């Protein structure tokens, strides 16, 4: 009888733990619930469209007058996603995930809210590295120089989208993920150099990390203000 009761108690405890785990997994979670993109291979193994090639339209299933989407089809990389306007908030993440026009992930929804809350008429989502990978640890182990070169061409294009009379507002928002790959810091340095040609203003939002990395767009208030980001000092600290 005692042995039976002990066994029954053990089974009940296991059931309770299982229910508790199910409840935890059922809670909303932006990282878990969003669709994932796991790279099929290293991008060096792919035939990459140049940025100019990627500008050529191939689809008409979204409003081109409202959206920037380059390339305009789902691929292993993405150069640009955002809305059209004269005064965009240009957000810089580390690398793209699965978002597309009209199908924004939680990061892009946050970017859109913060852009609107700070008085910008649009947003442009750009990334330090163009490879799609929901999990940063799945990114290329070594920088694909061809992809990087075209991504920098895309960054120039992004800065050129700012209307006359407006200064490019570039929101550094890559978080601590920049530490995932050594080459990412060099990519940022080149972006900053290009930004100087356009007199870009670098911004950040939210609390910076202990090492000074700018906050990722997730988990920021919709009315979170953007503020100056001392990008030169930041680069010196890397």
Describe each model-derived feature in a short phrase.
Residues 4, 8-9, 23:
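Low-complexity, intrinsically disordered or signal/transmembrane-proximal segments
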Residues 6, 31-105, 117:
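Active-site and ligand/interface coordination hotspots across diverse enzymes
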Residues 37, 139-238:
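Glycine/proline-rich loop-helix segments at beta-alpha junctions forming the active-site rim
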Residues 78-84, 106-123, 156-163:
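Short amphipathic alpha-helices and their capping/turn segments at secondary-structure boundaries
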Residues 98, 132, 178:
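Feature marks short, surface-exposed loop/turn motifs that line or immediately flank catalytic pockets
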Residues 121-139:
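Short connector loops at secondary-structure junctions
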């Amino acid at each position: 009888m005692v042995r039976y009761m002990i066994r029954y108690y053990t089974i009940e405890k296991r059931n309770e733990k299982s229910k508790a785990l199910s409840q935890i997994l059922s809670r909303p979670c932006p990282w878990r619930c969003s669709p994932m993109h796991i790279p099929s291979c290293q991008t060096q193994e792919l035939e990459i469209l140049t940025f100019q090639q990627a500008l050529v339209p191939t689809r008409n299933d979204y409003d081109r007058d409202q959206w920037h989407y380059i390339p305009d089809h789902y691929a292993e990389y993405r150069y640009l996603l955002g809305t059209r306007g004269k005064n965009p908030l240009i957000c810089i993440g580390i690398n793209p995930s699965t978002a597309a026009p009209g199908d924004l992930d939680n990061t892009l929804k946050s970017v859109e809210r913060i852009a609107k809350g700070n008085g910008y008429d649009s947003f442009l989502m750009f990334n330090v590295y163009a490879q799609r990978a929901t999990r940063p640890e799945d990114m290329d182990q070594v920088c694909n120089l061809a992809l990087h070169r075209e991504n920098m061409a895309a960054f120039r294009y992004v800065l050129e989208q700012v209307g006359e009379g407006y200064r490019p507002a570039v929101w550094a928002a890559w978080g601590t993920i920049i530490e995932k790959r050594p080459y990412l810091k060099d990519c940022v340095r080149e972006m900053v150099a290009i930004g100087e040609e356009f007199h870009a203003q670098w911004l950040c939002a939210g609390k910076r990390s202990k090492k000074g990395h700018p906050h990722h767009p997730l988990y920021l208030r919709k009315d979170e203000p953007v503020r100056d980001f001392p990008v030169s000092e930041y680069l010196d600290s890397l």
